[in-house]
Amino acid sequence: MVAATVAAAWLLLWAAACAQQEQDFYDFKAVNIRGKLVSLEKYRGSVSLVVNVASECGFTDQHYRALQQLQRDLGPHHFNVLAFPCNQFGQQEPDSNKEIESFARRTYSVSFPMFSKIAVTGTGAHPAFKYLAQTSGKEPTWNFWKYLVAPDGKVVGAWDPTVSVEEVRPQITALVRKLILLKREDL
């Protein structure tokens, strides 16, 4: 009886560990910039570039322009930039979500999804960013960290803000092309 109980407990622990290992980026939820809870599952099957953004950073202009161009060029082909404002680095995103959205849309005409301001590091970090940091081995240390997420939700690349969007673009484009070819084969 004791052996059966121990075996059952071990089996439950093993199953729980396996279930945790199966988690991916698209399993999380986040609040969008307008306050609505969104399942990131809606982006499954697409390539995503997840970025922690800030409005008052030295990297803001270069990154926002390049991210919007990337969204414009690749968005029609199962790709999304997913922007998460963050005020943890240099207090460079101090405004409200409404002001952040207004700034991004007015200044850069952003058309990519934006989410509510979050923490991306530390104990209060959003679970999706904890996942990105743990699976890539690279935790954000400043604004405009970029994580490339495959259609299956797995992280396939991570870059700090000194790496430009243009430098990352070939890897993103290759992943999008691969996805397009797979979708064509399914027809």
Swiss-Prot record:
It catalyses: 2 glutathione + H2O2 = glutathione disulfide + 2 H2O. Its EC number is 1.11.1.9. GO terms for molecular function: catalase activity; glutathione peroxidase activity; peroxidase activity. InterPro entries: Glut_perox_Gpx7 (IPR013376), Glutathione_peroxidase (IPR000889), GPX_AS (IPR029759), GPX_CS (IPR029760), Thioredoxin-like_sf (IPR036249). It is found in: Secreted. Expressed in esophageal epithelial cells; expression is up-regulated after exposure to acidic bile acids. Keywords: Oxidoreductase, Peroxidase, Secreted, Signal. One of its GO terms (biological process) is cellular response to oxidative stress. The keyword Membrane does not apply. The active site is at C57. Its main location: secreted. Residues 1-19 form the signal peptide. CDD domains: GSH_Peroxidase. GO terms for cellular component: endoplasmic reticulum; endoplasmic reticulum lumen; extracellular region. It is linked to Barrett esophagus: A condition characterized by a metaplastic change in which normal esophageal squamous epithelium is replaced by a columnar and intestinal-type epithelium. Patients with Barrett esophagus have an increased risk of esophageal adenocarcinoma. The main cause of Barrett esophagus is gastroesophageal reflux. The retrograde movement of acid and bile salts from the stomach into the esophagus causes prolonged injury to the esophageal epithelium and induces chronic esophagitis, which in turn is believed to trigger the pathologic changes. Belongs to the glutathione peroxidase family. This is Glutathione peroxidase 7. It comes from Homo sapiens. The gene is GPX7.
